[in-house]
Amino acid sequence: MDHVQVDYPTVGTAVITFRGEHDLVARDELRAMLDLLVEQHTLVVADFSEAKFVDSTTLHALLDADMAARRQGRKFRLLLDTQAIVRAAFELSGVLNRLDYTNSRAEALGDESPAPFVY
């Protein structure tokens, strides 16, 4: 996938950074990548700070990854220090009511759950 990069800042942690636009075209690759990361790491952070657009297939893949992580006793977290249009997709879809998220990379990589976003 051209628009994602995976980094491993600490043992057991993976950060998948989304750049540009994310839609139906790369759905299957994204699902496979998220499944693998959740299986192999205790914390997976999906970083949308460089994303320009996300569609419902991306949001659904994130929800599925979160459910898989919870079943395995692992953590899945969003980093949403991002553009207003991307944040709006998360807010309007209701995804933020179901997923752990923060606006801070340091908080996203920490052990404690981030505080909810406050307007």
What spans do the regions from the language model cover?
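ABC-family nucleotide-binding domains
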Residues: 55
